Every structure is written in C-alpha cells, then in structure tokens.
Amino acid sequence: INWKKIKSLIKAAMS
C-alpha cells in the first residue's frame, strides 16, 4: 500500500 499516494488522494478529496 502506498500511503503517500493515499494521503495525497485524501487531501485532494477534502479540498
């Protein structure tokens, strides 16, 4: 699991 990618996706979704 790529946490950096997932974290980026979550950040983008919360934007």
Swiss-Prot record:
Major localisation: secreted
Residue positions, PTM Serine amide: S15
Gene Ontology CC, one term: extracellular region
One Gene Ontology molecular-function label: toxin activity
Subcellular location: Secreted
Tissue expression as described in the entry: Expressed by the venom gland.
Keywords linked to the UniProt accession: Amidation, Antibiotic, Antimicrobial, Fungicide, G-protein coupled receptor impairing toxin, Immunity, Innate immunity, Mast cell degranulation, Secreted, Toxin
One of the protein's GO biological processes: innate immune response
Function of the molecule: Antimicrobial peptide with high activity on Gram-positive (S.mutans, and S.aureus), and Gram-negative bacteria (S.enterica), as well as on fungi (C.albicans, C.glabrata, and C.neoformans). Shows a potent hemolysis on human erythrocytes. Together with phospholipase A1, stimulates prostaglandin E2 release from murine peritoneal cells and macrophages. Its mast cell degranulation activity may be related to the activation of G-protein coupled receptors in mast cells as well as interaction with other proteins located in cell endosomal membranes in the mast cells.
Entry's family note: Belongs to the MCD family. Mastoparan subfamily.
Protein name as annotated: Mastoparan-V2
